[in-house]
Amino acid sequence: QAMIMTDRDNNQITAFHPGAMMQAHITQIEKRSDIKLAIISPDGRDAMVQHAEQLKAADIPFVFDPGQGLPMFDGADLARFIDQATWVTVNDYEGKMLSDRTGLSHADISRRVKGLIVTLGAEGCEVWVDGEKTVVPPVKAASVVDPTGCGDAWRGALMFGLEQGWSLAK
């Protein structure tokens, strides 16, 4: 359960309780020919750790998108996720925290995965591949009412694009 409050300046306060996600680690991921792509996003801590290990062992490519779950992990945990993942995506705030905790720059992280995407809100995003940064301009909104859910929309678009074989910059 999540409650997200946004003021007129787009400052957010989030309250989150994992509820049933605390049992998500019970679900096991096995190698299957019909699973082509996965995502590790905010979940119970144990589930995030175990599912990343299981996806790596099953050779299933996955996106590591820690979101609001990032503060649960120390630098060693986060470095392990990076090394297991195929791609990493974070927003600018999370990207700074990820770099601070791991001691890895965005360029460093991008050399350990196929790509790192750092979203910048209304400013678009940075796509890092092999240490090189490409700035992708934003799609201008006709009007912004509430940014709640933008991260979920981003995840869906990213997964769709990866499944289609599109480049990260597309």
Q: What are the functions of these language-model segments?
A:
Residues 1, 47-48, 155:
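Short glycine/serine/threonine-rich phosphate/pyrophosphate-binding segments
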Residues 1-2, 11-14, 36-37, 61-62, ...:
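Structural motif
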Residues 1-37:
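Conserved N-terminal subdomain of the carbohydrate kinase-like
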Residues 15, 98, 128:
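Residues that scaffold the ATP/ADP-binding catalytic core of kinase and kinase-like folds
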Residues 17-21, 66-70, 93-94, 139-142:
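Short, acidic/turn-prone active-site loops that include or flank metal/cofactor-
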Residues 32-33, 82, 110:
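A short, aliphatic-rich alpha-helical micro-motif
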Residues 37-106, 123-125:
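Conserved beta-alpha-beta core of the PfkB/ribokinase-like small-molecule kinase fold
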Residues 101-170:
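Conserved phosphate-binding/catalytic region of the ribokinase-like
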